[in-house]
Amino acid sequence: MRILDYDKVIERILEFIREKGNNGVVIGISGGVDSATVAYLATKALGKEKVLGLIMPYFENKDVEDAKLVAEKLGIGYKVINIKPIVDSFVENLELNLDRKGLGNIMSRTRMIMLYAHANSLGRIVLGTSNRSEFLTGYFTKWGDGASDYAPIINLYKTEVWEIAKRIGVPERIVKKKPSAGLWEGQTDEDELGISYNLLDEILWRMIDLKIGKEEIAKDLGIPLSLVERVEELIKKSEHKRRLPIGPSFEDLIVGP
């Protein structure tokens, strides 16, 4: 895995947030390590008065306690918004037979609406909390948790976010907890992805950054080729999530000025 100069990485993120978020930022705080890390960095960069955290549970669990812990340790303003009645009303009016994943996407997009409503009313921007591991594999909801104005940790792998979190003082219980998108009870990222972040990041780094072939990656890591191919498939299938919508080109059909 690549080795970063973490002190300089942290300083660069702080400079980035100061430049982009000078008027203030709004962050969705889930109780997980990614959002906690962004909240800590934003508070260090801008001061607590310029950071608003939104905690938006669909159901009450320990994540809400962890999210509150982050906000209260930082001394930032925060709001707890129960999105269950909003989501349930929306689903009821859709009159569709949604599966668990479909419901999860609506939860995520509801949170996005909340974030932007608050940001717009305050003249602030939304800071995203996606990391590189999620971004490359498409492990996010399009126009949901993947939506933000700026994303300070999007070029850091999950394992690198863990390292930064430890260095900047994110509570240990948050750093060590199993990552979860909080879309249903007992849901974890690694169960859904079918691979640990430690191994996923090793594969992604070799495949994307170093451009190493699949067979060599499998041999290098001592894992089945099928696992490397599964990661490659996740990247390919989620390509549309990493760009704005595109349409057909008509440049070759121009017949006049």
UniProtKB/Swiss-Prot annotation:
Biological or metabolic pathway of the protein: Cofactor biosynthesis; NAD(+) biosynthesis; NAD(+) from deamido-NAD(+) (ammonia route): step 1/1
GO biological process: DNA topological change; NAD biosynthetic process
GO MF term list: ATP binding; double-stranded DNA binding; glutaminase activity; metal ion binding; NAD+ synthase (glutamine-hydrolyzing) activity; NAD+ synthase activity
Keyword 4Fe-4S applies: no
Binding site for Mg(2+): D34, E134
Keywords associated with the record: ATP-binding, Ligase, Magnesium, Metal-binding, NAD, Nucleotide-binding
Binding annotation for deamido-NAD(+): R109, K142, D149, H240, K241
Amino-acid positions noted as binding ATP in the UniProt annotation, renumbered to this chain: G28, I29, S30, G31, G32, V33, D34, S35, T129, K158, S180
Enzyme Commission number, as recorded: 6.3.1.5
Reaction equations catalysed: deamido-NAD(+) + NH4(+) + ATP = AMP + diphosphate + NAD(+) + H(+)
Gene Ontology terms: cellular component: cytoplasm
Top-level division of the source organism's lineage: Archaea
Pfam families, per the entry: NAD_synthase
HAMAP family reported for this sequence: NadE_ammonia_dep
Quaternary structure note: Homodimer.
Role, per record: Catalyzes the ATP-dependent amidation of deamido-NAD to form NAD. Uses ammonia as a nitrogen source.
Family: Belongs to the NAD synthetase family.
NCBIfam families registered for this protein in UniProt: nadE, PRK13980.1
Protein name stated in the entry: NH(3)-dependent NAD(+) synthetase
Species this chain originates from: Pyrococcus horikoshii (strain ATCC 700860 / DSM 12428 / JCM 9974 / NBRC 100139 / OT-3)
